[in-house]
């Protein structure tokens, strides 16, 4: 889907989340090759590079992202996904966190997916403070598709006379077709993961306005 070690100096696929960051290719740090992407002038901890997925990835398909990241000193670096739902609300999903001691931390084949009713889907990096951040060997790939095992009894059928078999899933977990197939085969009850939490169902602006 996309792969860059920034050896050609091109960082145009990435933008700053805060609008204040300076994003450049640098030969001062590199996980492999001679160059990496440098993100400096971060004013807040959530400032960092973001990568738009809308025109590169399809809804309902599972992907993996890999990268190497480091900061100037000890730090927790987070790889996350952001998307906007049909009502215009923005949501954030922490995919993985790694610790950098001033050395390179690696994110390897971290899975993600998103549903059809969302837009402005980004992968992004952030860390605990305003330290300069470096990213190298960034790659997004289509994840292997593993069909479910159909030649076994369905749990919901085995216990049909006793109780329901349920599971909890979030929107992004439910997006891949293989997950839908697995749930349809074995479960007859679903609990939404984060979608029923207060921040997902309450109108934040209206709540603040009413005091």
Identify the residue ranges that each predicted region occupies.
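Extracellular and organelle-lumenal recognition/adhesion modules and their flexible linkers in secreted
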Residues: 1-165, 173, 177-181, 185-186
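Structural recognition of the beta-strand scaffold that forms the well-ordered cores
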Residues: 164-169, 188-200
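Aromatic-lined substrate-binding rim segments of carbohydrate-active enzymes
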Residues: 152-157, 197-211
């Amino acid at each position: 889907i996309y792969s860059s070690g920034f050896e050609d100096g091109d960082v145009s696929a990435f933008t700053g989340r805060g609008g204040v960051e300076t994003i450049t290719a640098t030969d001062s740090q590199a996980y492999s090759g001679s160059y990496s992407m440098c993100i400096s002038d971060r004013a807040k901890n959530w400032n960092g590079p973001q990568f738009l997925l809308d025109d590169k990835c399809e809804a309902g398909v599972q992907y993996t992202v890999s990268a190497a990241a480091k900061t100037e000193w000890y730090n927790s670096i987070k790889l996350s996904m952001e998307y906007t739902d049909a009502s215009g609300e923005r949501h954030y999903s922490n995919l993985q966190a790694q610790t950098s001691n001033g050395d390179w931390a690696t994110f390897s084949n971290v899975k993600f997916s998103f549903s059809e009713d969302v837009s402005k889907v980004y992968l992004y990096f952030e860390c605990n403070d305003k330290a300069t951040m470096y990213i190298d060997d960034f790659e997004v790939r289509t994840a292997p598709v593993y069909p479910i095992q159909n030649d076994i009894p369905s749990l919901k059928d085995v216990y049909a006379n006793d109780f329901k078999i349920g599971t909890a899933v979030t929107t992004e977990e439910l997006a891949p077709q293989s997950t839908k197939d697995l749930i349809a085969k074995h479960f007859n009850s679903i609990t939404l993961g984060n979608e029923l939490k207060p921040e997902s169902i309450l109108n934040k602006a209206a709540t603040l306005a009413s005091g």
